Regions:
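Early extracytoplasmic/domain-onset interaction patches
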Residues: 8-54
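Beta-strand elements of well-folded, non-transmembrane domains
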Residues: 23-25, 37-43, 55-57, 122-126, ...
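Cysteine-centered nucleophilic/redox motifs
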Residues: 35, 116-118, 152
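Solvent-exposed beta-hairpin/edge-strand motifs
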Residues: 52-86, 146-163
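A cross-kingdom signal targeting lumenal/periplasmic-facing segments of multi-pass membrane
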Residues: 62-125, 131
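Beta-strand-rich interaction surfaces with strong enrichment in secreted/lumenal proteins
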Residues: 94-96, 106-110, 137-142, 172-174
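Secretory-pathway-linked proteins and extracytosolic
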Residues: 125-136, 142-245
């Protein structure tokens, strides 16, 4: 899923951020992201010259569909898939568990200069689900960033009940066809411009535009699903008893 680091909005401009989220009956998601960011300063080049995608390798895979540097004159330089895209485990903090399935897919954009843009298309696909038949997704659009066009489309089975909170976004479509239901939402930074970074006193998911969707009916169902998944691990066996003794 898209995660943009917080930097000064004046350093860059998000020209396009499109998320197409397709969910199957098992709860597995395929998320296609198309992103274009205009880099206005050297600080933005330093920040986005290597674009980092975080994912859980135990439950998902990431494919980079295309990646390009777009120069101010319109010419493009494609990222070398062999030399410019690589994967590594996420760093593990001292206080964190030593085992982690978190991975980083790093895309290195070549020949960047002020006024250029990075253009990236990638797909995040679930290979397994934490809770069978259930899904959730959460995207945020920090109001200190300059979004010229951000779009989210959710494509689910027509008979799958889904709760959606799209605070600060405009619903642009809601239609059903061929057993699927498609809902689309749009956000762009208001004419007054992004907020100053100093205004960040709470989490952006508390005050900024968000898209949150899930087919869980509530916290009670989440707790029940967690209990079912953890049940086998809760059972005692001889090895556990010996350790306890």
């Amino acid at each position: 899923m898209l995660q943009l680091s917080i930097a000064f909005a004046a350093d860059y401009r998000i020209e396009r951020c499109d998320n197409l989220i397709t969910v199957d009956p098992s709860g597995k998601r395929v998320i296609k992201v198309d992103l274009s960011i205009k880099l206005l300063t050297d600080a933005a080049i330093a920040r986005f010259g290597q674009y980092v995608l975080s994912y859980n390798a135990q439950f998902a895979k990431v494919d980079v569909n295309s990646a390009q540097t777009v120069h101010a004159d319109g010419s493009t330089v494609s990222v070398d898939a062999a030399q410019g895209i690589f994967d590594r485990p996420a760093p593990v903090a001292i206080a964190a568990p030593q085992f982690s399935a978190e991975h980083l897919r790093i895309v290195t954009f070549p020949a960047l200069a002020k006024g250029d843009s990075i253009r990236l298309s990638y797909t995040l696909a679930d290979t397994d689900t934490l809770f069978p038949g259930k899904f959730s997704v959460q995207l945020s659009f920090p109001p200190i960033e300059d979004y010229r066009s951000a779009n989210v489309t959710l494509d689910t089975p027509d008979d799958m009940p889904v709760a959606i909170d799209a605070r600060g976004m405009h619903q642009s479509a809601d239609a059903s066809r061929d057993g699927r239901r498609l809902r689309s939402y749009h956000y762009e930074t208001p004419p007054s411009g992004p907020l100053d970074e100093q205004a960040n006193t709470v989490a952006w998911t508390d005050i900024g535009p968000v898209f949150i969707a899930s087919n869980f009916s509530g916290y009670a169902e989440i707790a029940h699903a967690y209990h079912i998944r953890a049940f086998d691990q809760q059972q005692q066996d001889d090895a556990i008893r010996q350790l306890a003794n």
